[in-house]
Amino acid sequence: MEGISHRTLLVNGVNIHVAEKGEGPVVLLLHGFPELWFSWRHQIVSLAARGYRAVAPDLRGFGDSDAPPSSSVYTAFHVVGDLVALIQSLGPDQVFVVGHDWGAYMAWWLCILRPDMVKALVNLSVAYAPRNPGRRPVDACKTIFGDDHYICRFQEHGAIEAEIAQIGTTLFMKKFLTYRKPAALIIPKDKGLEVSLETPVTLPSWLSEEDINYFASKFEKSGFTGGLNYYRCLNLNWELTAPWTEVQVDVPVKFIIGDLDLTYHTPGIQDYIHKGGFKSAVPFLEDVVVMEGVGHFINQERPHEVSDLIYDFIHKF
């Protein structure tokens, strides 16, 4: 695709596939679930044209990267370990980082654990959430949303994979990537994914059949367990990060979110983002952009605007 090159690097004991294009300062692009490097296809081309070296890995567990079988090796420490080794293999002492969804979560922790390696961060959709020492995150989801919240359902080893297999990878990708309800995603056990996620009559203009087929072809090979293991490590992350309770993120940050993103409608999140809590936890937060009429998969839905927002921030450094 438009001169994007691919290679596999052995980093931190796992083979990580990366897509890259361009020369100049490195911009590391980190995807979420259920996604791949391909989610950044538009930003890779745009950033390369503007004088940057855009590098988008398949995170461990996804796509053409290794997917270790144990669910306990998908913690923030394992994934950040991959990212540190990847950055070191790319050469520069510091990189720009852009994250979305789980990629944003891991980018926050990269900045906490190795702020020396990050020039500046642009994160999409997932705001930094300081550790709550009084409640494990999955327990919090159950309390707020009930046992059928998608994060709770994703904890069940094998069960959600079986539901995905029942409807098929291609249909699951269509349903998940086009989910646009500004509310919590609930997957009742008695109804499952088939009913809980609507099937689009037609794909939106930003997502083609070819795009869906690319995603589906990779997940057909890799399966979904690697990606789901990120959710299954949420409570383990909480346990392991106890020494970092009340830590701040001390790198320059820009945050972008869509007003139809389900994460923007988590109870209390808008007050946190806009009324000082976020800025307190991320003191070098320079800008928050709320894009109107945009759902969760913001970098694909509004590729040119997101690319411009990224460039407008990082070119200052």
Residue ranges with predicted function:
Residues 2-5, 15-16, 26, 62-98, ...:
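Flexible "cap/lid" subdomain of the alpha/beta-hydrolase fold that forms the substrate-access gate
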Residues 1-7, 316-317:
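Basic/polar N-terminal segments that are highly enriched at the extreme N-terminus
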Residues 29, 56-57, 99, 123, ...:
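Conserved SAM-binding loop
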Residues 33, 37-40, 102, 108, ...:
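Signature tryptophan residues that serve as conserved aromatic anchors
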Residues 14-67:
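Conserved HGGG/HGGXW glycine-rich cap/lid loop of the alpha/beta-hydrolase fold
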Residues 283-317:
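Catalytic active-site module of serine/aspartate enzymes centered on a nucleophile-bearing elbow/loop
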